């Protein structure tokens, strides 16, 4: 099954529930569904607040599924493609979504009902408010321990929210 981001609306509040059994990863399908959810929410002037949460018990979004990203990187290397200011990469869905969430006039709330690492944590950081359900959950940007730069703005948002010293602890 590929990732989903299902939108429900109750009055002025929209709820976006994430589901990607069985690992709880964000993938390209969930990324596309998230952008579509942001489009739908931004098009409805009656919506004043948005709650992002996981639809699986104990899981918000564990992290971005790196298998397709690794395959894409290998394909680009095989074709001799490298980053260039003359040929920038197009904005990925997660970047579009987090940028639009930050710029939105609505209140975005990350209701963290479980683990949120990597891309899931970065999505939560883009929200105005983060609420955490009690439990043994993990949060952070573990990719930095593998010398991989977080790719969805976490390195900028986290220090702004908690300060540089605390950000380094995560």
Predicted regions and their residues:
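Conserved CoA-thioester-binding segment of acyl-CoA-metabolizing enzymes
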Residues: 1-53, 75
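Hydrophobic/aromatic residues within transmembrane alpha-helices
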Residues: 16, 52, 65, 123-124
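A generic "binding-loop/recognition-motif" signal
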Residues: 22, 56, 135-137
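Charged catalytic carboxylate motif
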Residues: 29-33, 93, 100
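Alpha-helical elements of Rossmann-like donor-binding domains used by nucleotide-donor carbohydrate transfer enzymes
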Residues: 33-36, 96, 169
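Glycine- (often His-adjacent) and acidic-residue-rich active-site loop
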Residues: 54-96, 147
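Crotonase-fold acyl-CoA enzyme core
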Residues: 99-170
């Amino acid at each position: 099954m590929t990732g989903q981001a299902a939108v429900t609306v109750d009055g002025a509040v929209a709820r976006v529930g994430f589901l990607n059994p069985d690992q709880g990863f964000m993938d390209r399908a969930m990324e596309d569904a998230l952008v579509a959810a942001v489009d739908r929410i931004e098009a409805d002037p009656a919506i004043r607040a948005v709650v992002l949460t996981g639809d699986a018990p104990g899981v918000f979004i564990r992290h971005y599924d790196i298998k397709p990203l690794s395959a894409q990187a290998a394909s680009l290397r095989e074709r001799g493609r490298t980053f260039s200011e003359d040929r920038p990469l197009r904005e990925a869905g997660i970047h579009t979504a987090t940028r639009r969430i930050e710029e939105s006039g609505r209140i975005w709330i990350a209701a963290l009902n479980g683990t949120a690492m990597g891309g899931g944590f970065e999505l939560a950081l883009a929200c105005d408010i983060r609420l955490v359900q009690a439990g043994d959950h993990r949060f952070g940007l573990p990719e930095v321990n593998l010398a991989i730069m977080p790719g969805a703005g976490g390195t900028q948002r986290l220090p702004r929210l908690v300060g540089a010293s605390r950000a380094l602890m995560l």
